[in-house]
A protein has these predicted regions:
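Secreted/periplasmic proteins
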Residues: 10-200
Length: 200
């Protein structure tokens, strides 16, 4: 989550350890946009990454097209707003985005809140969460749309969809994928990453 992810080489160093936020388990990246300023969209790079270690736990990033998992989701917001994400974008707490420890960045996943069956496609553009038993960290806006912002955490299902485009904002398209318990419609191609069309 908006962390300086030189984790593979720095996670075991004393210098890195001194900077780790005990609440989140990682060091925060620099804030490049202040609250109230316009947050630029896109601008990152496609990244899978090498294995890395945080707080004694090894994470192995991979491009797993069949990824589907259930676990706890949390959300992050003001503390990380305007900071660089792990793939070089800028975190916007009001965008439809998420942090995941191993999935490619940027990519799309559908997140379903198992308590109310709301689901939403979000953009994974950061690494995390690294605290407790959390599986994915959603932006403030994503947690609000999925109905668990006030609770702080929710049990969710995460399903990988595919790569996300590097440039521009996809927020409007992603908000349109919100489902309130009804099945998602047949996929429609709305973006492209390289030569591969992405269906949302």
């Amino acid at each position: 989550m908006a962390a300086a992810l030189a984790l593979a080489s720095c996670a075991s160093s004393d210098k890195f350890a001194r900077k780790v936020d005990p609440k989140y388990g990682v060091a925060s990246s620099p804030r490049v946009v202040e609250m109230g300023e316009r947050v630029p969209k896109g601008g990152g790079v496609y990244r899978v990454g090498k294995p890395y270690v945080v707080s004694g736990r090894t994470y192995i990033p991979e491009e797993n097209t069949s990824y589907r998992s259930e676990g706890l989701a949390s959300w992050y917001g003001r503390d990380f707003h305007g900071r660089l994400t792990a793939n070089g974008e800028v975190f916007d707490m009001e965008s439809i985005s998420a942090a995941h420890p191993t999935l490619p960045m940027p990519s799309y996943v559908r997140v379903t809140n198992l308590a109310n069956q709301r689901s939403l496609i979000v953009r994974v553009n950061d690494r995390g969460p690294f605290h407790g038993n959390r599986m994915i960290d959603l932006s403030h806006k994503s947690a609000q749309l999925l109905g668990f912002k006030d609770n702080g955490v929710a049990r969710v299902r995460v399903e990988y969809i595919g790569r996300a485009a590097l440039e521009g904002s996809d927020d409007r398209r992603l908000v349109a994928t919100l489902r309130h318990g009804e099945p998602a419609p047949a996929p429609v191609v709305v973006a492209a990453a390289g030569n591969a069309p992405i269906a949302l």
